[in-house]
């Protein structure tokens, strides 16, 4: 160990430098040889660490600021900086551009040694190279790419080197002789000389390739576990389960045969293993046959097969024994059972049918024509039309209905159905009663009133040539009720029978006064501007005004002449009795008796007057009408 190396180690311990700073100090030492490539490669790798990067760059800037006698510190620091720009982190170039002034000052570096040799020229040339690399970004990018490729190539070439190369990297801290310690052994001297890179670029490339390959090996995903072991375990578990099942079956059957004892032949064992498969196949066949039979029952559109039964059910899934034995005439869409037709008597059907299905004489299509039911007392059906013959009047309870006549024949045998949209028939009510019903001002009719929930109370008019029915008039149902055989019809009393012969001489006063019919509107919300309002709540002002004579004779005040109080101005208005009466309009002598003084004496009250003044209406003088500004106010 040289004296400079020993002194450097002591300084490292005294100043407590970190590992990165120690490496930079060793690479930029004052020794007469250049920095080794392996050491610079380690420093370049440290620049990718944030903490180590700050320590490395701090020591480099300190070395660049040394004095002239330590020109090797400056030169080696520039050499290390050039190497870091090409192979280190990109932050090195960024920080060098920030401290570009520090590098530019080294262009004028001067130092002449004792022999008179200018040693500063080496520093000035190195500064020019570094400055050119920093200013040209494209060149810096190319240099970095080329250095990376060289490092990878050298790493691939160095993969065949044995473990003897490891001694090349092992060294004692701060000892420059440690880099050649591996060559001291004559055993590995020849191999190391052949594998050792000739240039620093090759050495750096080998190191980078080695690091990349080790990193790739570490990041390689773990290969998936083989499924062979899992398959073997699954087969073993299945075999054990099968054996346990066989043992359970044998113990349940109590079989002591050689089969149960484990001496079963191989052929019987195969047959026994195939039995579950056969059972499964049989179950599948049974399921298919059951499904096919269900589909046959569900085929309701196919013609029914010939069966000995004479009845056929309307149910598509009926019992096959109830199908007809002969093919029905006509197409398959021929007469069929109506689901809404009356149910026949119970003895006509077989008791084997659980839902009392309707018997028909044709195929079982539920959407076909209605067949003729067998004779017999029909069962009450809430959906079937009524059978007794009666004539419904035109003024029934249904305001939208029409007169319909039903017959006692079969409800399904040709009777016309009830049509709610048919044209209503003419009313049989006498014309005189209809005219009198229209003449009634109250809107009440002796027999019928239009059923309109949104209409007014005016009497109904004829529509479509007949009177509209009244919903609550039950008198029209009297004709539909059957007559009892033991009772005679009670005669209906009429005005002629009640009043006698004098009824013909009476005059109907209601028919003489006819109220004007208001415009009928079917829409209660159609109240536009064109429709006049039926009543005006503010129409009090339209009444006739009283004449002057009526006002004079109708409201005398305290015995005054009809013309009003003496001295009252023409057109003045007298005050109401509910308000204080002004003294200027009524004389004192006219309002109070003469015996009553105006001011009562002390301790006594004036007796009330015999009569209070009557309320006076507004009067107008005989000289002319009211002024134009006095309008008619309906609230006065």
Swiss-Prot record:
GO MF terms held by the record: EH domain binding; lipid binding
Chief place where the protein resides: cytoplasm
Sequence repeats: 315-317, 338-340, 365-367, 381-383, 398-400, 523-525, 536-538, 633-635
Span of domain ENTH: 12-144
Biased composition (Low complexity): 174-189
Region named Disordered: 153-503, 607-636
PANTHER family xref list: EPSIN-3, EPSIN/ENT-RELATED
Name this polypeptide is given: Epsin-3
